[in-house]
C-alpha cells in the first residue's frame, strides 16, 4: 500500500460520519462537534464564510490515505487537526521571539503550520485513527513528513505540534533522528530523499494539574495538606459561604441556552476589563451546548442576598468545564463583579469536588498560574514538537530549547517543593515533577 497526505480547508470536507469512524478517544476537543463549532461559530476561518473572518487560523486538516494497487479507492487511515497560522495568538506555546528573530534577519516566520486544537492548551491525542499502536506511530510520522513537504512546497517557516499526548509525542520524538526513517515510514520518497534534512525539536512547558488519590470528599483531600495551608483554603471557602454565595453545578441538558448567554456575558466582560476580547463567540458556545452537552460542566456562583440588585438574574460568575471519562478540563471563566477568592472557588475547588464526586482521576485547570500550587495542583510537564525549515534557524532554536528544557525541569522541581502537602502525603520522589504524557 502506498500512503499519501492531502489537505482540506474545512472539517466539513471530511464529514462527521468519516470523523466518527476514525475517532478513538473521548477527548472533547477532538470531537467533530467541537472543531466544527470553531468554524461555524466564526472563531476561525472557513471557506463557507461570506465575509472572510481573517482570524489568522485557517483550517488545513491533514488526511493520511492508503492506496492499494488493485483499487482506485483511497482508504483514510488517519486525520490530524492542522491549521495555517498568520500569527501566534491562541497557541500557548510561545514562539514570538522566534518570529522576531526571523524579522530581524529579513525573513518571514508566518505563515506556519500548527498541529493542535485552536485556543486549547491541553494535552491530548493529535491524530484520529483506528490503527493499532505500531500503525499509529507510523501514521504520526507520515503525517509529519506530509507537513514537512507541504511547508517546503508552500514556503512556510515550519510546523509545530502542540500539547501532544504520550502516543503522539513519542512518535514525533523519533523524528529528532532523521536516520530513523526507513521504507515503512516513508510516503513516496526513498530514505535518501527524506524531507527531514534536519531534525524535529522537542520543547517542554510546565502547567499545574490535580490528581485524584481516591479521595472521598474535599475534607479528605485537605487532610493531605499541612495545617496552615488547610486552614487557608477552609477560610477562603468559608468566607464566600458566610457571605451568602450559592454554587450550582450543571451538566449536560441541565445547562440551558439562557445559562450559556449569562456565562458568555461574564466571559467577555472579564476580557473587556483587560481591554481584550475572548477568542470564542456566543455562537460557538451555543453550538457545543446543542451538539455535545454530555461533555460540559457549568459552575455558577449566585449573588449573596445582600448584594442582589433589581436585576432578577443573580448569577455573578460562571466557569465552563469540559470532561471525559478520566479527565476534567477547566477552560473558560467570567464574572460580573470581583469577590475575594471567587475565582478559586469556581475554577478550582468546585472542579476538585466534581472530580471526587464522580471518580475522575485528573483535572487540568488551564495553563499558567502559580497560585494553583498552594491549592494542591502539581507541576506537570507538557510537550510540543517543532520542525523549522531554515537550517541555521533550526540549529539556533534547537540550542535554545536544550537550555530552556533544563530551566523548565528545574522550575518544575522547585515548584513541587512549594506544594502544600504534609510529609506523609509526599511522593517517594518529591522532587520529580509529574509528566503529563504519562497520565
Feature annotation, model-predicted:
Residues 1-439:
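N-acyltransferase acceptor-side catalytic subdomain
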Amino acid at each position: 500500500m502506498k500512503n499519501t497526505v492531502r489537505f482540506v480547508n474545512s472539517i466539513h470536507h471530511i464529514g462527521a460520519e468519516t470523523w466518527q469512524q476514525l475517532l478513538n478517544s473521548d477527548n472533547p476537543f477532538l470531537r467533530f462537534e467541537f472543531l466544527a463549532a470553531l468554524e461555524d461559530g466564526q472563531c476561525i476561518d472557513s471557506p463557507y464564510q461570506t465575509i472572510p473572518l481573517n482570524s489568522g487560523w485557517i483550517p488545513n486538516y491533514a488526511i493520511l490515505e492508503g492506496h492499494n494497487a488493485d483499487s482506485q479507492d483511497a482508504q483514510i487511515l488517519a486525520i490530524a487537526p492542522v491549521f495555517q497560522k498568520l500569527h501566534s495568538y491562541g497557541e500557548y506555546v510561545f514562539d514570538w521571539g522566534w518570529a522576531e528573530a526571523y524579522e530581524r534577519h529579513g525573513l518571514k516566520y508566518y505563515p506556519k503550520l500548527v498541529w493542535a486544537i485552536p485556543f486549547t492548551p491541553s494535552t491530548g491525542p493529535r491524530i484520529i485513527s483506528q490503527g493499532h499502536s505500531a500503525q499509529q506511530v507510523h501514521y504520526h510520522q507520515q503525517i509529519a513528513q506530509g507537513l514537512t513537504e507541504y511547508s517546503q512546497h508552500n514556503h512556510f517557516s515550519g510546523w509545530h505540534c502542540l500539547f501532544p499526548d504520550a502516543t503522539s509525542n513519542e512518535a514525533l520524538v523519533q523524528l529528532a533522528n532523521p536516520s530513523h526513517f526507513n521504507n515503512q515510514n516513508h510516503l513516496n520518497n526513498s530514505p535518501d530523499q527524506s524531507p527531514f534534512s534536519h531534525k524535529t525539536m522537542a520543547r517542554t512547558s510546565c502547567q499545574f494539574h490535580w490528581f485524584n488519590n481516591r479521595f472521598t470528599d474535599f475534607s479528605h483531600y485537605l487532610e493531605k495538606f499541612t495545617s496552615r495551608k488547610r486552614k487557608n483554603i477552609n477560610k477562603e471557602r468559608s468566607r464566600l459561604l458566610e457571605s451568602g454565595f450559592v454554587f450550582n453545578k450543571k451538566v449536560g441538558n441541565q445547562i440551558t441556552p439562557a445559562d450559556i448567554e449569562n456565562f458568555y456575558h461574564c466571559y467577555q466582560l472579564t476580557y473587556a476589563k483587560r481591554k481584550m476580547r475572548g477568542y470564542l463567540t456566543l455562537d460557538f458556545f451555543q453550538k457545543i451546548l446543542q451538539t455535545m452537552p454530555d461533555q460540559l460542566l457549568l459552575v455558577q456562583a449566585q449573588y449573596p442576598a445582600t448584594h442582589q440588585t433589581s436585576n432578577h438574574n443573580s448569577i455573578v460568575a460562571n466557569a465552563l468545564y469540559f470532561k471525559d471519562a478520566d479527565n476534567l478540563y477547566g477552560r473558560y471563566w467570567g464574572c460580573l463583579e470581583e469577590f475575594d477568592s471567587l475565582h478559586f472557588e469556581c475554577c478550582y475547588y468546585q472542579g476538585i469536588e466534581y472530580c471526587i464526586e464522580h471518580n475522575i482521576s485528573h483535572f487540568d485547570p488551564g495553563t499558567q498560574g502559580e497560585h494553583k500550587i498552594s491549592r494542591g495542583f502539581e507541576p506537570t510537564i507538557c510537550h510540543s514538537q517543532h520542525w523549522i525549515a531554515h537550517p541555521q534557524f533550526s540549529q539556533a532554536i534547537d540550542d535554545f530549547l536544550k537550555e530552556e528544557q533544563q530551566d523548565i525541569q528545574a522550575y518544575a522541581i522547585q515548584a513541587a517543593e512549594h506544594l502544600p502537602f504534609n510529609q506523609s502525603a509526599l511522593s517517594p520522589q518529591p522532587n520529580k515533577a509529574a509528566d503529563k504524557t504519562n497520565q
